[in-house]
Amino acid sequence: MGLEIVVKDIQEGASAEVSRIKAEGDAKASEIINEAKEVQKKTLGDSLAKAEEDLQNLHQQVISSANLEVKRITLNKRKDLLDKVYVQTVEKIKSMPASKKEELLKNILSKYEASGARVYSSKDSEDIVKKLTSLSYAGNLDAIGGIVLENEDGTVRLDFTYDSILKNVYERSLKQISDLLYG
């Protein structure tokens, strides 16, 4: 019977060892599962945070693109309007009464005549310019109106043609619009 007691002791010892190993295994498995859950939560949280950040960035890009498109459309509309005003102004200048043309030329010549020795004008304004100034008439220009003054040796030309004045106003207006829209 001594052998049965020894076998029983060995079985009880083995059973206790199996229970201990099983308990350690369960504890380790539970620990690994908990760690995996924590890693999963952190990964999910990081993924959600990244997705939110990406969504916010995309939202900002869409808003910026929309604002830029609105500015571009606005600039184009204003440019179209300036183009129309430019064409209308040219037509108004061309159809201006002779008395008004003479008055404008007289104002330009009274202010700037001393700066030149020769004067150029459009063919339409030639007779008026010759009447208003004692400067040497040097010829005709392809312009809608106004004059160009030139010094004695031809090195300096002052352009007071309406074409030039309109072009300068037009370009300044475009620059102002662009500055307003794009800072």
Swiss-Prot record:
Family annotation (InterPro entries): ATPase_E_C (IPR038495), ATPase_V1_Esu (IPR002842)
SUPFAM superfamilies linked: V-type ATPase subunit E-like (SSF160527)
Subunit text: Has multiple subunits with at least A(3), B(3), C, D, E, F, H, I and proteolipid K(x).
Subcellular location: Cell membrane
Family listed: Belongs to the V-ATPase E subunit family.
A UniProt-annotated Pfam family: vATP-synt_E
GO cellular-component term (any): proton-transporting two-sector ATPase complex, catalytic domain
GO biological process: proton motive force-driven plasma membrane ATP synthesis
Keyword Transport: yes
Name of the featured protein: A-type ATP synthase subunit E
Function as written in the Swiss-Prot or TrEMBL entry: Component of the A-type ATP synthase that produces ATP from ADP in the presence of a proton gradient across the membrane.
Alphabetical UniProt keywords: ATP synthesis, Cell membrane, Hydrogen ion transport, Ion transport, Membrane, Transport
GO molecular function, one term: ATP binding
Keyword flag Membrane: yes
Topology relative to the membrane: Peripheral membrane protein
